């Protein structure tokens, strides 16, 4: 068993390769092999969002603060609110983030396949982000 203190977790700013705007990440679960589960607390400032991406085994989001958006390729963004849980099936192209006027924090839970939890695609355009 391993207990990780909250004081030992490092908050880091998310990479601009995969995010637009200011996004902060805290690793919650980085279970060693053979376990596959990974979880992050991700905080998006207003207007911030992920790039388009997929997850090999799907992803669950749980909204812990604020109001956000989630969008599946070729669809309009949908609102996510505090307390909502969203399941994204394996390999579904999507993005998620805050609205233009509200911050949003979610817990992102996904499993790794061959060490990979996501495949990152292109950045989300302002047109795709409009709701």
State the predicted function of each range:
Residues 50-52, 70-71, 88, 93-100:
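Short beta-strand His + acidic residue motifs that chelate non-heme Fe in jelly-roll/DSBH
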Residues 74-91:
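Short acidic-glycine-tyrosine-enriched beta hairpin
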Residues 24-27, 38-55:
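Conserved short histidine dyad/triad with adjacent acidic residue
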Residues 1-36, 117-131:
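A short, N-terminal "cap"/entry segment at the start of jelly-roll beta-barrel domains
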Residues 57-69, 73-74:
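Glycine- and acidic-residue-biased ligand/ion/polar-headgroup-sensing regions
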